[in-house]
Regions:
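Helix-to-loop junctions at the C-terminal end of transmembrane segments
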Residues: 69-82, 273-286, 370
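C-terminal ends and interior cores of transmembrane alpha-helices
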Residues: 92-107, 296-308
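Short amphipathic helix-loop junctions that connect adjacent transmembrane helices
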Residues: 30-53, 242-258
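Symmetry-related core transmembrane helices of the 12-TM Major Facilitator Superfamily/SLC fold
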Residues: 177-194, 378-394
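Cytoplasmic helix-loop-helix junction between adjacent transmembrane helices
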Residues: 116-153
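Hydrophobic core of transmembrane alpha-helices in multi-pass small-molecule transporters
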Residues: 18, 97, 110-125, 312-326
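Conserved MFS/SLC helix-loop-helix module at the cytosolic interface between two early adjacent transmembrane helices
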Residues: 68-105
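Juxtamembrane intracellular "pre-TM" segments in multi-pass secondary transporters
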Residues: 1-6, 198-227
Length: 412
């Protein structure tokens, strides 16, 4: 009976992250056209193309900056006060952010739009808390499976959100409708959490565990290498997605519906990658997932700039999407496995903060890379993917050497 309850709770968590990511990604197809197209009126008609790109970068960068600040803190609060109360707080804050975004777009108010991104980023620690909840209910054998299913939910959200948002904006002619739909979806998610998720107490302390600040947790020797790999891995993903829409708008003049279709085309392989990762995790070490996933991802990212037709782009989405999901599974499980049960929320909050915070690095480094050519952000993403594969390989070799040394010492 307990196993049935655990599985039921897990699928509610999958629905929760699906709605959370769908709500976040609903407005994504409209942000680039909203800021880059002078006819939309978000900026003055005299604004230069360069200044429009800068403001787009600021709007995109505020979200990860404040998630980097908020996610570890909210995760730590969930360790102390329980997952459900803090998850509820997150959703209320995110809902307020989406409402401000809708008003900012409707009124063409740049300050409101900027404030909305601050609120959305700071309170969007819900995915980290859901991952901590999945870790709480997992055994070492089921953790990779449970995390893979959470990833499937996130990727499904990336399919539903941009499709609904892109079509809603084009059909209605009102770009604020996508944000209002995000408000509605977040409200449904909040009700789902309040009604269906059990309110479990914090993890009982078997021994007194000294509290760690975010900086101290980041520096833990068992975690630091995997946090670095997380930053590199998501740096590649964020470089890819940050300049994904910009490339398609500038090079191919795609509209919000076409951008939404592109998001679907890359998200479907990501869902497939989560399923493949779940199957491989039954037989492979986590390091093998990290190596293979990041190499496959790097290959897809490198090929993205080559095609000029939609079907060619779709072919590059297959390795990119599959590799991203396998790489994410490898990094998330590695961090969770090396974190104390009483620090799962804080560790996964820091993980999500680094994951989304890597977008800041992507915006800064990618903006400089754009000076060399619009394809250079994708070259840098490829390099980050290769470095991640090498990092997992190096950590695996080090672990094998320590294991061999221990085996040689033990008989003596």
């Amino acid at each position: 009976m307990e196993g049935i309850k655990t599985q039921a709770t897990l699928w509610v968590l999958v629905m929760t992250v699906t709605l959370a990511v769908a709500g976040f990604s609903l407005p994504s197809p409209v942000l680039a056209p909203l800021m880059l197209d002078p006819a939309q009126g978000m900026l003055s008609p005299e604004a230069s193309d360069w200044s429009r790109k800068v403001w787009l970068g600021v709007i995109m960068g505020l979200y990860p900056l404040f998630q980097l600040l908020g996610a570890p803190w909210l995760g730590k609060l969930s360790d102390r006060y329980g997952r459900k109360p803090i998850l509820t707080l997150c959703l209320i804050g995110v809902l307020a952010g989406y409402a401000l975004m809708a008003l900012g777009i409707a009124w063409r108010s740049l300050p409101l739009l900027l404030l909305s991104r601050v609120l959305e980023g700071f309170f969007n620690g819900d995915i980290a808390i859901v991952q901590a909840m999945a870790a709480d209910m997992s055994t070492p054998k089921t953790k990779a499976r449970n995390f893979a299913r959470i990833n499937i939910g996130m990727n499904l959200g990336w399919v539903l959100g941009p499709m609904i948002g892109g079509y809603a904006a084009v059909i209605s002619g009102d770009y604020s409708l996508a944000a209002w739909l995000a408000v509605a979806m977040t409200a449904v998610n909040l009700l789902l959490i309040l009604w269906l998720i059990p309110n479990r107490p914090p993890v009982a302390a078997e021994q007194t565990l000294a509290p760690l600040s975010t900086w101290q947790l980041l520096q833990q020797p068992r975690l630091l290498p995997y946090f670095v790999l997380t930053l590199l891995s998501y740096g590649a993903v964020q470089l890819y997605f940050t300049y994904f829409n910009v490339w398609l708008v500038e090079r191919l003049a795609w509209d919000p519906v076409q951008l939404a279709q592109a998001a679907v085309l890359v998200s479907v392989p990501m869902m497939l990658g989560s399923w493949i990762g779940e199957q491989l995790a039954r037989h492979w070490r986590g390091s093998s997932l990290g190596i293979v996933g990041h190499l496959v991802m790097a290959a897809g990212m490198l090929m993205f700039v080559l095609p000029s037709q939609w079907w060619g782009l779709a072919l590059t989405f297959i390795p990119a999407g599959i590799g991203m999901s396998i790489g994410e599974l490898a990094t998330s499980v590695a961090v969770s496995n090396r974190s104390h049960p009483q620090q799962q929320g804080q560790a996964m909050g820091l993980y999500r903060g680094l994951a989304v915070g890597s977008e800041i690095l992507a915006v800064v480094v990618g903006s400089v890379a754009l000076l060399a050519g619009t394809e250079w952000p994708f070259y840098l993403a490829t390099l980050c993917g290769v470095l991640c594969a090498l990092g997992f390989y190096g950590l695996r070799r080090g672990a094998d050497r320590r294991e061999q040394a221990g085996a040689q010492v033990e008989p003596g």
